[in-house]
From Swiss-Prot:
Protein known as: Terpene cyclase paxB
Protein source organism: Penicillium paxilli
Regions that span the bilayer: 23-43, 49-69, 78-98, 112-132, 134-154, 172-194, 205-225
Source domain of life: Eukaryota
Gene: paxB
Molecular functions (GO terms): lyase activity
Functional note: Terpene cyclase; part of the ATM2 gene cluster that mediates the biosynthesis of paxilline, a mycotoxin that acts as an inhibitor of mammalian maxi-K channels. PaxG, the geranylgeranyl diphosphate (GGPP) synthase is proposed to catalyze the first step in paxilline biosynthesis. Condensation of indole-3-glycerol phosphate with GGPP by paxC then forms 3-geranylgeranylindole (3-GGI), followed by epoxidation and cyclization of this intermediate (by paxM and paxB) to form paspaline.
Length: 243
């Protein structure tokens, strides 16, 4: 029993499955709000909201677990498909406006579409290889951990490098945090009530990843507040456009 087929779950987990499904819905709501918000912010600020590599890794993960190794849970499948479809809009907006951020690097500016394609295919092959190596159930979770850490580090790095709230907002940060913390809650229930399959979630590496995620995303909120306050003190009415 690898934990991917919910029908194989023990009675203890089946009893709290509605709560687990609620966390999955919360995860979906958080990320769908985040994706829709990123599309809106991208067109409003004429830039991209998610860093390039995290975006490519994230959409590759969704493609793999929607098409190649789909979950047997209808709730998870529904959430993943909604997220994937909206994420295509995020990718389109990112490709449309990415060149505006790379005027200082002509090689990147002229080949941005190719970079997105190659990076997405690279991450997609990596997620598939991981699933074939350790099994879809474990790879599904470890791939999500990789995506989350890339998103957290990439988001903070992008904010600090731009020195501007361009492409970002409190709503994007809060919705991303909601989606990710609901994922943690969902995983926690599986660890507590389905330990036969998910006892590994109590491993040092998983706990380290959780601490890193909470620390970086918490620090992101502080940095965003500081950058936003600085923009207002300088009389900047809106996020600065890229040069």
């Amino acid at each position: 029993m690898d934990g991917f087929d919910v029908s194989q779950a023990p009675p203890e987990y089946q009893a709290i499955k509605p709560l687990a499904d609620l966390f999955v819905v919360g995860m979906g709501v958080g990320w769908i709000i985040n994706y829709i918000g990123m599309v809106y912010i991208s067109f409003k600020h004429e830039t991209y909201g998610m860093s390039i590599m995290p975006l490519c890794c994230n959409i590759a993960w969704e493609l793999v677990y929607c098409l190649v190794f789909p979950s047997k849970s209808p709730v998870e499948r529904g959430v993943f498909w909604m997220g994937l479809l909206i994420n295509f809009g995020v990718m389109y907006a990112a490709i449309t406006f990415s060149s505006r951020e790379w005027g200082h690097a002509p090689l990147v500016e002229r080949n941005i579409s190719l970079i997105f394609f190659v990076a997405t295919m690279g991450f997609l092959s990596g997620h598939v290889a991981l699933a074939l190596e350790i099994g879809p159930a474990l790879a599904y979770s470890w791939g999500a951990v990789i995506c989350q850490l890339l998103l957290s580090v990439g988001g903070l790095s992008q904010l600090l490098c731009r020195g501007s709230t361009r492409g970002a907002s409190y709503t994007l940060w809060a919705s991303r945090f909601l989606g990710s913390t609901c994922t943690v809650g969902f995983a926690g229930l599986r660890w507590m009530y389905w330990s036969e399959a998910f006892g590994w979630l109590n491993s040092p590496l998983v706990l380290w990843s959780l601490v890193v995620f909470l620390s970086i995303d918490g620090f992101y909120g502080i940095c965003f507040w500081y950058v936003d306050r600085n923009e207002k003190s300088l009389g900047i009415s809106g996020p600065k456009k890229a040069n």
